[in-house]
């Protein structure tokens, strides 16, 4: 997989995590999903 493909995949996973965060009413779960999204965005930047 090329670096550009990997970056797109990480960004897609970040968006999915952000969608999960918006759907959950639980504050702690929301914070967890947002941390996951941030981690994927950081991975995408590193590519």
Give the positions of each predicted feature:
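Terminal alpha-helical segments
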Residues: 1-47
